[in-house]
Amino acid sequence: MKIYVDADACPVVSIVERVAQEMKIPVTLLCDTNHILNSTYSDIKIIGAGADAVDFALINLCHRGDVVVTQDYGVAAMALGKGAYAIHQSGKLYENDNIDRMLMERHIAKKARRASSKNHMKGPRKRTSEDDERFEAAFRRLIMRGKV
């Protein structure tokens, strides 16, 4: 098992690294040239800037049984297709029985935004320590499930 993180603006990198180091699981952080990452534990792969370049690089690296941390539903769907596990930074697991619905909801929301004359969107709410705890608990459960 290896862990791959879509690390562009990912708020859970430090949690992933801490848990992975504790469990002796290798981590690869992938980001584009617009981000600077430093790590004493993880392998860092900087991918040339370009639409979805990091996403495709991550999918090319992952294999069955690996864990992918991403907030991108498309990346999660491709990871599941390769037999990898996928988890959102919120702690929500992407699974074969929920990914189609999530992709459809994303599509509908995108169409609604395009059709609306009001294009202002509120950003996500501020991340809390409870969010981090929820992610860590789900991440640990996922790793244990993958090790069985």
From Swiss-Prot:
InterPro entries: UPF0178
Family: Belongs to the UPF0178 family.
Record NCBIfam families: PRK00124.1
Name of the molecule in the record: UPF0178 protein CA_C2825
Organism: Clostridium acetobutylicum (strain ATCC 824 / DSM 792 / JCM 1419 / IAM 19013 / LMG 5710 / NBRC 13948 / NRRL B-527 / VKM B-1787 / 2291 / W)
Higher taxonomy: Bacteria, Bacillati, Bacillota, Clostridia, Eubacteriales
